[in-house]
Amino acid sequence: MKRVYSKIESIVGNVITVMAQNVKYGELAIVRSKDSSSLAEVIKLDRDKVSLQVYNGTIGISTADEVKFLGHPMQVTFSENLLGRIFDGAGNPKDGGPRLEDDLIEIGGPSANPAKRIVPRNMIRTGIPMIDVFNTLVESQKLPIFSVSGEPYNELLIRIALQAEVDLIILGGMGLKNDDYLTFKDYLEKGGALSRTIFFVNTANDPVVESLTVPDISLAVAEKFALQGKKVLVLLTDMTNFADAMKEIAITMEQVPSNRGYPGDLYSQLASRYEKAIDFEGAGSITILAVTTMPGDDITHPVPDNTGYITEGQYYLKGGRIEPFGSLSRLKQMVNGKTRDDHRTIMDAMIKLYASSKESIEKKAMGFNMTEWDEKLIKYSGMFESKLMDLSVNIPLEEALDLGWEILFSCFEPKETGIRTELVEKYWPQKKD
């Protein structure tokens, strides 16, 4: 069977077309020119007409260059030696360390059999009150972080990477600015978390096709570690860059565009990645947190809109804080009844009072007379935002719950909170003499 072809039919953008037989979708090839060689991936099959996306671009490639098909899809090394290392979107070392070429595994495989999934039952502690108390992150959950450009979403991921109580962090960056890449690298090194982290990164200067491989490589490695009993947290940023890379390639391929120019299979492409989140019976788990930026703060944009149908809630980052009203963890009820007996009560009471405070703040801004109750709510709102909502707050769950009681004590009488008497008697702070 012929695997080497010496004629390229056409070159359009970063896509080349070759007439070849017995080639599979997703198969890798090497394009050899006079001065260099580049990896390429089969992205379209039309009988014997094969289209390949060239990773390093087509500059310097001519129609007389050689294309050699490798007979397998993208692969990545799997071993404990990955820990503490940084790689690009093709799995090549980016940290100056040695190449790892043993124990190769294929990426982009199917999600695990649903019959092997177990009901989520364990909390992942992060030290961030707006997550731990109000929208608990659950092991094997898949959650996006919706945000607009300019919000500290990467800083939030760094905090989670440093503090999350998991065995292993896999960080996947797509279309990262070089400054953001260096920030991740520096904080992970200084915080001592790099030793339990594997970092796959595609920067804005790297080939756009690598944005598509970063989630697949990250999740393939995560699945192997999970099957070995590891509790793995996969952090991805930014899934909108991933979707934009899909859009760019689809335009090059002259595919019929769907909503706002994105390809028609955007939903299934996103779902195939998010559905990798799983808790294996008798083994480990994969939990996915993925930043999704919203152009113009538009929740109806195709990427966040499709994502919302796939995931189990979302964290909504706005004004430098995790917004309680736009955020939701649909699995929190699976675990927040097992933490402390006042967890759900504090969560519900504080959010209800915070919602009421917004009405009082609006009344004050419009010049209405303030009642004593309005003044209490406004005071409470300020304390809640500064002591619990601020992303710089870093305390364990139990301390956050105690702090919640302190805030309520500072602003209200027990009967004004709507909390059950038995919990008030157990947790309400005592007045100091």
UniProtKB/Swiss-Prot annotation:
Q: Tell me the lineage of the source organism.
A: Bacteria, Pseudomonadati, Spirochaetota, Spirochaetia, Spirochaetales
Give the record's keywords alphabetically. Answer: ATP synthesis, Hydrogen ion transport, Ion transport, Transport
A Pfam family cross-referenced in the UniProt record is ATP-synt_ab_N
- Function field: Produces ATP from ADP in the presence of a proton gradient across the membrane. The V-type beta chain is a regulatory subunit.
Q: Which superkingdom does the taxonomy of this entry point to?
A: Bacteria
| Family, per entry | Belongs to the ATPase alpha/beta chains family.
- One GO BP: proton motive force-driven plasma membrane ATP synthesis
Q: Identify a single GO molecular function assigned to this protein.
A: ATP binding
Record-linked CDD domains: V_A-ATPase_B
Query: What name does this protein carry?
Result: V-type ATP synthase beta chain
The record, for InterPro entries, names: ATP-synt_VA_C, ATPase_F1/V1/A1_a/bsu_N, ATPase_F1/V1/A1_a/bsu_nucl-bd, P-loop_NTPase, V-ATPase_su_B/beta
